[in-house]
Amino acid sequence: MEGKWLLCLLLVLGTAAIQAHDGHDDDMIDIEDDLDDVIEEVEDSKSKSDTSTPPSPKVTYKAPVPTGEVYFADSFDRGSLSGWILSKAKKDDTDDEIAKYDGKWEVDEMKETKLPGDKGLVLMSRAKHHAISAKLNKPFLFDTKPLIVQYEVNFQNGIECGGAYVKLLSKTSELNLDQFHDKTPYTIMFGPDKCGEDYKLHFIFRHKNPKTGVYEEKHAKRPDADLKTYFTDKKTHLYTLILNPDNSFEILVDQSVVNSGNLLNDMTPPVNPSREIEDPEDRKPEDWDERPKIADPDAVKPDDWDEDAPSKIPDEEATKPEGWLDDEPEYIPDPDAEKPEDWDEDMDGEWEAPQIANPKCESAPGCGVWQRPMIDNPNYKGKWKPPMIDNPNYQGIWKPRKIPNPDFFEDLEPFRMTPFSAIGLELWSMTSDIFFDNFIISGDRRVVDDWANDGWGLKKAADGAAEPGVVGQMLEAAEERPWLWVVYILTVALPVFLVILFCCSGKKQSNAMEYKKTDAPQPDVKDEEGKEEEKNKGDEEEEEEKLEEKQKSDAEEDGGTGSQDEEDSKPKAEEDEILNRSPRNRKPRRE
């Protein structure tokens, strides 16, 4: 009960606040102005206090250095594009206006860097083709060492449609980096790519058919992990590809595995073709019967089957309702309508008033010619069809026969791919300021991990040092998603309200405790409490009258000792009265 009163009180206070707001708009404006002044003062004092407060410890940047043998490594901290070659090629089958690879590249720090001095390769322009590449220290040969490719990407402005993948360019005599374009042969393509709501993390390798010498792209299965955050959180992420001589592979993001598999089993299309194929010359015989069911040829239509019977018939038991207005139309011309002044009968034809519902039909069951309602025809059977039976001549679904695949081959070591001698980025992007950093290619996992700790690890530590607290993160999230304010308010206000409700609502004493304290009469049955009270009241009055008469007679007999007896009789009378009220001494109910 007290909880209900508290809820009512809150509703009343809320209503009063709304009414006060409606009646004192001018006062609220003044209050808002005062609050603005206070906020400005707080911000000024905060800025002053910030200047006096010592800054939080910062992570000092130091360029990573390879700790072992690498085929390629670049942290861009020298501040230039030296070692990288911009493409001068044009794309085939593309308009001249966009065929050129004229997208801009620069070496610069991130726009909101937490590590001063840390620079990277930045794709600067949007809606342009970009191509840049660099030679390896020496070509990578797929022999007994694993291949590990790793680099960092930060979508500083998010990403609408575009990629941030790398290509490992195949070692060929025709390789010319200043003519690097989309058709330049590559061995592996690896990295993130996104367009619309399709988030990808590519791993593609080009496999050479040992029989024909033709290369075919093999795509790894899609990762099971949700990749969206890596494209939208505007943080630097570390992408790693590991290929092992046993044909296994792993794809990691921020040093956590998001995809893994085997080159023989988890690529599409498969590396090795099937041993048998369907004979392209085989043809289905003309008498081949693929029908599992056929109409029973021995079935006969029953004599009483009427195919012409309609599905609906008029209800012969229906009668026209009383008051039906047969002579009144359901719609009539609007008597209040007037022909527009600009109506030209030569151009617009003869003017007719718009139709409105007949007002006479509103009080009647209906207007116009009455027709019997339609009901389902109990004799309707429809078109007769013979029942279906199993086809005794069913031969199954025809398939062409299998023959040995003339193009079959079996490559059990797809890891031994075409050697590559350069790394390149050939990208189209609708978003600018894509930041690349800390490329490394090696055959030693330890060297790559050390490089990651000295490069990406510092970025992660710097981001953690500058990361706002839990409250700050909640406020930032609410700024991006305003509906979170409702969640925060409910999360905070509801527990507070429950605590107040618990503290303010005292434990109510039970009725049994109350009766025990006062020795008041307690009804045996609550539903008959009213009747019992009326009956007990009459019995009490009768007992009191008898008690008074007895006291008077005792007083007359005792004379001088009457006063003392009266004093003794008072507590006794009160005790008798209490006993009479007790449910144990209550008289039986009168029927």
UniProtKB/Swiss-Prot annotation:
Stretch list, region 4 X approximate repeats: 279-346, 349-406
Protein name: Calnexin
Annotated segments matching region Disordered: 261-347, 514-591
Subunit structure, interactors included: Interacts with MAPK3/ERK1. Interacts with KCNH2. Associates with ribosomes. Interacts with SGIP1; involved in negative regulation of endocytosis. The palmitoylated form interacts with the ribosome-translocon complex component SSR1, promoting efficient folding of glycoproteins. Interacts with SERPINA2P/SERPINA2 and with the S and Z variants of SERPINA1. Interacts with PPIB. Interacts with ZNRF4. Interacts with SMIM22. Interacts with TMX2. Interacts with TMEM35A/NACHO and CHRNA7. Interacts with reticulophagy regulators RETREG2 and RETREG3.
Disulfide cysteine pairs (residue numbers): 161-195, 361-367
Main location: endoplasmic reticulum
Summary of the function given for this chain in its UniProt record: Calcium-binding protein that interacts with newly synthesized monoglucosylated glycoproteins in the endoplasmic reticulum. It may act in assisting protein assembly and/or in the retention within the ER of unassembled protein subunits. It seems to play a major role in the quality control apparatus of the ER by the retention of incorrectly folded proteins. Associated with partial T-cell antigen receptor complexes that escape the ER of immature thymocytes, it may function as a signaling complex regulating thymocyte maturation.
GO terms of biological process kind: clathrin-dependent endocytosis; ERAD pathway; protein folding; synaptic vesicle endocytosis
Topological type in the membrane: Single-pass type I membrane protein
Region (Interaction with PPIB): 327-360
Modified residue annotations for Phosphoserine: 553, 563, 582
Molecular function per GO: apolipoprotein binding; calcium ion binding; carbohydrate binding; ionotropic glutamate receptor binding; unfolded protein binding
Taxon lineage: Eukaryota, Metazoa, Chordata, Craniata, Vertebrata
Acidic residues compositional bias, start-end: 324-347, 555-568
Lumenal side: 21-482
Membrane topology, Cytoplasmic segments: 504-591
Family as reported in the entry's similarity comment: Belongs to the calreticulin family.
